[in-house]
Amino acid sequence: MSKTRVYELAQQMGIDNKELMARLADAGVSVKNHMAVLEDSDIKALSAPAQTPHKEVSQEEVRVKPTLIRRRAKAVEPEAASAEAASAPAAQEEAPQKAEPEKVEAEKAEAPKPRQAAEPVRARIIEAAPVPKPAAAPAEAAKPEKAKPAEPAPVAAAPKAAEAPAAPAAEAAPAAPAPAEAPVAKPAAKLEASAPAAPAAPAAAAPVEAQAPAKAEEQEPEKATPTRARILGRVEIPIPAQRPAERREYQRTAPGERPAPRPGMPRGVERPGTERPAPRPGGPRPAGAPGRPGERPTTGRPGGPTGGRPDRPAPLAPIDAPPLLGDDRRKGRKPAPAGGTDYAKNGKKGAPAAAGKGKKDSFKDILDKRERVFEPGPRSKGRKGKYEKVQIGKKTEITVPKAIKRIIKISESITVGELAKRMGIKATDLIRALMKLGVMATINHPLDFDTATLLATDFGYEIENVALDVDEILEAEPDTPESLLKRPPVVTIMGHVDHGKTSLLDAIREANVIAGEAGGITQHIGAYDVELNGKKITFLDTPGHEAFTAMRARGAKVTDIVILVVAADDGVMPQTREAVNHSKAAGVPIIVAINKIDKPDASPGKVKQELMEFGLVSEEWGGETIFVEVSAKKRINLESLLEMVLLQADVLELRANPDKPARGTIVEAKLDKGRGPVATVLVQEGTLKSGDYFVAGVHYGRVRAMQNDRGEKVLAAGPAMPVEVIGFNGVPDAGDIFVAMGDEKQAKEIANHRQMKLRESELAKHSKLSLEQLYEKIQKGEVKDLNAIVKGDVQGSVEAVAESLRKLSTDAIRLNVLHASVGAITETDVNLASASNAIILGFNVRPEVKAAALAEKEGVDVRLYNIIYDAVDDIKKAMEGLLEPTFKEKYLGRAEIREVFSVPKAGMVAGSYVTDGKIVRNAQVRLLRDNMVVYEGKLGSLRRFKDDVKEVATGYECGMSLENYNDLKIGDIFECFEMEKVAGKL
């Protein structure tokens, strides 16, 4: 099924889009605008002939192309004439009804008629179809009403034997009664007679004459040849004179008739003898086919009433139109604009246009048509208002996207440039809108969801947040009561440093872990599995040093029971208080283990009393807290402590579902040189198996292997079981949630999303200085920076060291941890330190050979530590070295002026007596007069009995002079002092 748009059909017919839409509306075909698509059925409805019986008798249809139907008449000339005569009487009966409203047109048309100059226009049309006048008169009188129904059809029918003769008559009949018709026909006949004189006239007339449809078929291929254009050109200068009159007639149509096309559209008149393609073949030709006997003289070109409306359809359907339509299709519909422009040009300039010029001006004609389509002009005033509204609405439809396209999906943030691209506007417009909101932005400036929504609303768009909802994806599934099974308790040992936490755990595990810790203090979280009487207990050992607060907080969060270790000889200490607070914040029950009871100065009662301040009251004293007195060294009461742990676990009724994907917590993580990133994972629910995909923080991976705290390989880890997992793509942070995933793609997507969010938050922290901040910085003096790179053996230690260093920052000096990671010191770290003037701190790690050589070459300070105390102290000293030293005044002594002498070349010299301290040469001195400072400067000379001396002690006399000052008087006091440098302190 072929589909043709309204504007294409209008171009083929050579009429205005509005007029075609009006015809379609009259034919019952509803179209919204000139871009609407017409089906074949719509075109047939539009082109339905007024005299259907004649169509059936006289024509046969042949489909030449999907979009072209060629109708050919079966009858010969005599048949056409007889059909014409037959239709005339019927038309004559109806003519009187229409004649009255169209008399006005007749009167208007008759005024220009005497001007013979205008008649060649008709002559051109008639020239193609010289017909006996007697036949025309009755036809003209007969056809007005029959032709009217066919008028709305923009598509002219191919040659119709019966209908074609009737149509030309229709044009003439509305014009006026027969008397008006006669004068018109006579000049036409005269011109007709003169036309053959031209050499090309016979060639043109013969095909158009078309007394039989067969002739019309023969002439069809010739329609596209230049001879047609030359025939048009042969119309002499009289055309210009008639053209304006015709235009006026077009504009002043009778109220009952549809408005004529604007003057720029004379293509319809010109079509019979030009290259102008006929409209779609299926349409009726209200004006009749050219060449019908007796019809041509009445073609309403000269007649006013006829020239208004009916005149237009006549040229739309010349007999030879179908071939031209084919040519038009092949040539991109250029012939139609060419012919019409040619005629318009003749009308304006008064000179016949050559065939070549017609083609040259086709582009202008196209532009003219576009103006009529898109810009309602003064000639559209007479049209129905609804068509103009359609045109205005059409502009809005073209410029405003559909509602579904006005929704922009973003993932939490979007750059200005990307937002502008998606909205189809310029980025500068968005930047201008942001500036109005007080935001100075560039094209790459990221916009958050709220700002983007605010901006998009101003431009008529909506923003939809399609960010990945990680929390929803990782949300734990609720467990049914029957799926929950009993699990071992997770116990965390907490307390102050050196109170015996690790020793107690070693005694329980019968191992010697503390021997492996540097300085005898724990600097890692350790996870261990202990079995007592067939029951398992999982222990987490946390550091007690103040720097490991985060580790203790993590330990308290993932645990079920906390064992608070307090030394009986030391009592409650700062980290003991902190451990109690962490446990209470996590809502975890506390069992107090009073350690070192074997020491002579042990005082368990004192410990119980101190802990009462924190609400930990012993059961012996009527409280609810379990206290157990133990000795890790002597292994006293260890079993009693474990029994209390199991008892507390039974009270808590600890249960978990092992038949689900594993979830847990990263207890500790490190970078192993042989195995890569390794993390200690405490499984809290579900079962972790080898081969499972997982995500932990910004890292993901697949479980390659697992082993327990004793180094044994494990294939599956159930709830409350700590295991070392190998298979991470990076070293995760301690405390990250570990979640087993169904596939690697989902795990990777979540990890990448978290990585992007982390990067955005880090960028937000490093904001640029504003002018006000910069001014304050200048006023106070530039802040000193000490950059550091921290490397450690495990993630927890690195985190603790970095946090301790950050706490050393002051207003005067700021410590920046540029990079903190797990693993040995590499060349990359040295290069970073060299570029940023940073020092490298290694905690329980050593530099690689190449890295050490590079550090020595670049002069990078690499410091290695095993104990966190030493690292913090060294950094503190380094920071103090960056501080500006302060100066302190040191008092030396006083001397009183007893006499003043004038010495040539030396100026005034004061004979003085040292009353206090000592006077030192080259020291700073103040001259006091009545306890007021008169002068402060440097001592010029110091002599005793004409000898220069370094200093003069109390009770001795001396001579002194000041540099560049001679106003000395008896009784003045010299106060001697010096300025000492004092190193800055944090």
UniProtKB/Swiss-Prot annotation:
The keyword Zinc-finger does not apply. Residues 486-653 form the tr-type G domain. It is found in: Cytoplasm. One of its GO terms (cellular component) is cytosol. Residues 520-524 are annotated as: G2. Residues 53-64, 95-113, 215-225, 268-278, 358-374 have a biased composition (Basic and acidic residues). Residues 541-544 are annotated as: G3. Residues 47-388 are annotated as: Disordered. Residues 495-502 are annotated as: G1. Residues 631-633 are annotated as: G5. The keyword Nucleotide-binding applies. GTP binds at residues 495-502, 541-545, 595-598. Residues 78-94, 127-141, 153-214, 286-300 have a biased composition (Low complexity). Its main location: cytoplasm. GO terms for molecular function: GTP binding; GTPase activity; translation initiation factor activity. It holds the Pfam family GTP_EFTU. Residues 595-598 are annotated as: G4. Keywords: Cytoplasm, GTP-binding, Initiation factor, Nucleotide-binding, Protein biosynthesis. One of the essential components for the initiation of protein synthesis. Protects formylmethionyl-tRNA from spontaneous hydrolysis and promotes its binding to the 30S ribosomal subunits. Also involved in the hydrolysis of GTP during the formation of the 70S ribosomal complex. Belongs to the TRAFAC class translation factor GTPase superfamily. Classic translation factor GTPase family. IF-2 subfamily. This is Translation initiation factor IF-2. It comes from Citrifermentans bemidjiense (strain ATCC BAA-1014 / DSM 16622 / JCM 12645 / Bem) (Geobacter bemidjiensis).
